[in-house]
Structure formats: C-alpha cells, structure tokens
C-alpha cells in the first residue's frame, strides 16, 4: 500500500436506491462526540478537521444520528461542512432518545419522528435529508406508524431515501410493504458476523448494507489470540494493519457493503481510507476465513 492517502473512490461506487451514488468507504461520526455518544469529544477542533479531511479524501457518505451527543454530531457536520461539496450524501438516524451516557430508549411515534426530522434538517442545514434511517424499531409502536410518518415526510420532499437499523430479514420484509427500504445498518465485522443472513438478504435485493463498528475485530486484533498472527502476516504483505485488512475484507465481502468506520483523528481516518486499495487474493481470502472460523 502507498504511504500517500488515496481517495475514497478506490473503494468503488454504490447507488443508494438505484439513483444516489456514493463511494463505498464512508465515515461514521459517533466518534466525533464524547464517550458513550454523550457530550463533546476531547478535541472538537480535531474532530472538525476529520470532517474537512474526509471531504478532501473524497468521502461522500457521512453517517450520523441525532442521538450522537445528543445533537452534537449533526450540529458539527452542519457547521463544518455546509454548504456541502457536490456529491456529499448525509445519512442520519432518528428514533432513539438518550437520557444519559450509555442510556437509550426507542421511540417510534409518528409525531416524535416528524419532530426529529425537522430538527435534524435544521442542525444539518439541509432542505432534504438524503438518507433517513429509523435508528431502532420501537416495539411499543406499530411499524406502520413509524415508517408511515417517514413516508409522509418523503412525499413532502424532506427525505430522499429511507433506511433501517438493527433489523432482521423478516423485519425488512415487513417494512418494505410500507415503504421502499434502500439501506440497512447493522453491526457487522470480520469477527462479528451475527447478521450474515441480513447481509445476504440485502445483497439479494440490492439494499445497501452499512456495517457499524466495522473494525471491531475484537480478539483478532490481540497478538496473543489464536489466528491473530496469521491476520498480521496477511496484512504485512500489503504493508497494512489488521484493522485495514478488516475493512478491505468488508469491501470484498459484498458489493452492497458500505463501511462507515468512525474516528476522531485525522491520521486514523487516512489509514481507514487507505484500506480501499487493499485487495485480498483468493488464497488470502481463504486464510482469513479459516482464522475467523477458529
């Protein structure tokens, strides 16, 4: 891999909803706020530099949520990047309240979601949100009510595309009877593949899959764990880190995967984007799969 940070274009392009192009390597913004998604981060100035550098590196997909901060990540994006560069796509989420650090409650009432969208538009300095994702399904509220509210806002031109987060194939099927679902955001990584069935469903139906926590290789990043030396050796062949290897694996795993690794440091951002140029050979892919199955 080159020492010069490449552009995100090397990761390839995906059309959200068939008409909204993004480079597949995106940026998640939860790390731009404090621990447990609460309050400001330790270095807000560096966090803003991350956003600027992301644009310079060609990243077009920025994923955020009103629950990050709460509100802080959206506000930082609006203050730092608006007016937005051509091609920049802002994806945000609503449907979670955060009473305190590490605390979450799911709220899917129609009136609440409409308010969430209105406030997100204001903070992000947008007239229309490119991709609005229901952050979690609220078991106390009929899905028809939650998604019906988002469909109404879509018809009004306030939302372009609608997505879901942390869902099963059955829930996606139910949702698609109400509104067109263009993306799904579930936890997924090289070492955490519990949502394999959901990813396969998304690939079958051309739905974008945004894996959150995509570098969470867990034990695979620890040198003293089984399989870790093998991953380190494969990464070293490419002049890369195991974290970069895990991102490259995601890009090769499925053409619908849109990794959104987060960071609060410019140097780490550049490392993540550089993973777009790493390509595993069939033999290396088999080696990685053998390690993951340990």
Predicted regions and their residues:
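N-terminal binding-site loop/beta-alpha segment at the start of enzyme catalytic domains
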Residues: 1-88
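Beta/alpha (TIM)-barrel catalytic core signal, keyed to glycine-rich beta->alpha loops juxtaposed to Asp/Glu
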Residues: 3-13, 137-294
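Acidic (Asp/Glu)-rich catalytic clusters
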Residues: 17, 78-89, 121-125, 176-178, ...
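N-terminal small/glycine-rich loop or linker at the start of catalytic domains
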Residues: 18-38, 91-104, 128, 133, ...
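Conserved beta-strand positions
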Residues: 27, 64, 92, 131-134, ...
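Alpha-helix N-cap and loop-to-helix initiation/capping positions
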Residues: 39-46, 72, 76, 104-115, ...
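Short, acidic/polar
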Residues: 40-54, 108-124, 168-174
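Active-site groove signature of glycoside hydrolases
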Residues: 121-139
């Amino acid at each position: 891999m080159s020492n010069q940070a490449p552009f995100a274009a090397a990761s390839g392009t995906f059309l959200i909803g068939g008409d909204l192009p993004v480079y597949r390597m995106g940026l998640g913004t939860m790390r731009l706020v404090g621990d447990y998604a609460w309050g400001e981060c330790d270095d807000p100035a560096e966090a803003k530099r991350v956003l600027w550098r992301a644009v310079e590196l060609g990243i077009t997909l920025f994923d955020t949520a009103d629950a990050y901060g709460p509100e802080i990540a959206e506000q930082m994006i609006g203050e730092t990047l608006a007016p937005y560069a051509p091609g920049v796509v802002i994806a945000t989420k609503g449907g979670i309240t955060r009473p305190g650090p590490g605390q979450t409650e799911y709220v899917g009432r129609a009136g609440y979601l409409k308010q969430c969208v209105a406030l997100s538009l204001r903070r992000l300095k947008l007239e229309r949100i490119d991709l609005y994702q229901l952050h979690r399904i609220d078991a106390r509220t009929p899905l028809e009510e939650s998604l019906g509210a988002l469909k109404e806002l879509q018809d009004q031109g306030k939302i372009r595309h609608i997505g879901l987060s942390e869902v099963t194939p059955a829930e996606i099927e139910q949702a698609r009877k109400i509104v067109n679902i263009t993306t799904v955001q579930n936890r997924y990584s090289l070492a955490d593949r519990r949502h394999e069935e959901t990813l396969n469903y998304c690939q079958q139906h051309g739905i974008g899959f945004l894996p959150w926590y995509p570098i969470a290789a867990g034990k695979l990043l620890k040198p003293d764990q089984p399989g870790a030396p093998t991953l380190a050796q494969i990464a070293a062949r490419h002049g890369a880190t195991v974290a970069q290897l895990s991102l490259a694996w995601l890009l090769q795993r499925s053409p619908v995967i849109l990794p959104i690794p987060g960071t609060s440091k410019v140097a780490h951002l550049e490392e993540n984007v550089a993973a777009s140029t790493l390509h595993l050979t069939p033999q290396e892919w088999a080696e990685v799969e053998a390690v993951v199955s340990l």
